[in-house]
Amino acid sequence: MAVPYPNKTNMNIYPGRALPTSATSRRIFLSQSAGIATLMAAAGVPVAMTTAKAEEEAPGRAGAGGFPSDFAWGAATAAFQVEGAVSEDGRLPCVWDTFCHKPGTTKNGDTGDVACDHYHRFESDVKLMAELGIKHYRFSIAWPRIVPEGRGAVNEKGVDFYSRLVDALLQHGITPHATLFHWDSPQALEDRYGSWRSREIASDFADYCTQVVKRLGDRVTNWMTINEIYCFTYMGYAVGKTPPHAPGTIVSSRQEVLQTVHHALLAHGMGCQAIRAATPKPAQVALVVNFDTYLPVIETPENIEAVKKAFVEEEHNGTVLVPALTGKYNEQTIAKLGADAPKVQAGDMEIIGQPLDVLGYNIYTGSYVRAADNARGYEILPLPREYPQMHMPWLNLVPESLYWGVRMISDALGKKNLPILITENGCATDDEVTGQGEILDLSRILYLRSYLGNAQRAIAEGYPLKGYFQWSLMDNFEWSWGYTRRFGITRVDYDTQQRSPKESFRWYQQVIRENKVL
């Protein structure tokens, strides 16, 4: 059964999830297996999959009910959301530090000043990862901790923190996956030239990448350039109103917003080049995207073709994903933008289209599409008010979105052999601690189970899905929502910093052990 929670301010502030939102947000809390089975079936997840006996698995190939033997199980965090220690050991402010300290920008005036205090507690957090059983951990490196001014001198104390973190991971048999930028650009560059409004940031980012890879590349060989370009561009800059994402800059035209997207893509491409030039060992280079995912409301040939069309033509994908993977903007998208389209200089697209070794795909929800007799040839369907949501106004329960997102990289963009990692997948739940001290986040288990079932479908059909990083290892600072939303499989008491594994932690632990959906 679904239990509604009280009305929350319908702040569609989490970027990149352009979905219809209802006035009353709802959460799903299921305490009986019958209810879970019913919703799983409704979501298109075979219930029998959860009890099927696993067969012996070969690398890259799933056995019945299981994942390939080399499937990468992991969890993820981001520097600003967990580290704290914003003024320690030479770190200078990032744009989110400045943004958080402006009245009215975050729930309850919350900041990332302390967050999960991971900076001081990383060793025990790594032990928690080992207890969970993950063999892969995705984290981000804070640019202003390494190069505090955004350019120039390297802060070796900042490097030392990540060096010690990497060593701790390796000592526990956990492979580090480092994201070089997860929204925390140095405030110094915002003050100097407006950060992403200037082309200069691409060169500064590449220089920063070089310094990090030179120092950590002997132990880190999995690099991700930038996380979710849409979020800090489209949501960080706006015309006529303060945007909900740092740097929170008001600009005079929509073209200026699109230009920040182009500069971020350029930074990604130059970052790829810098990583490959600096690494002392062969390395895998990825971009992490949160592209808009579309899926057919009914799986007919006409609707599937409509999904392909929407996937490449809708603005978010046409201005971020398509150029990153093909080296050119989608023509229909640019035509729709008209004078608002980004200005491109000679050689830009060759840099932007650097070949990737891996694509990181952050997937939370999706939109249903059907074929239509209109100029576009498709329509994106609104969701009814009673459609289930996961304690966020944008986070609708659409488990098939994971499968269709993976499939469209192959079918719509022709990247059939590009390995894909699910670099984020998870949900917020309204967790409560029982009198026995348990956190029975059964709705999160439902969510994860249903999405992982669709990961199995993608693998079974031959799509190159290679791993899964659960978001998140622990509750953390959820950007403009502050600490009012909990995405972790580990509860964090922000007063004491105590970590308490939730029921979803135990469930995911068993999934990893048995290498199948349970």
Annotated model-derived regions:
Residues 121-142:
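Catalytic domains of carbohydrate-active enzymes, especially glycoside hydrolases
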Residues 16, 33, 37, 55-69:
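Mature N-terminal, pre-catalytic/accessory segment of carbohydrate-active enzymes
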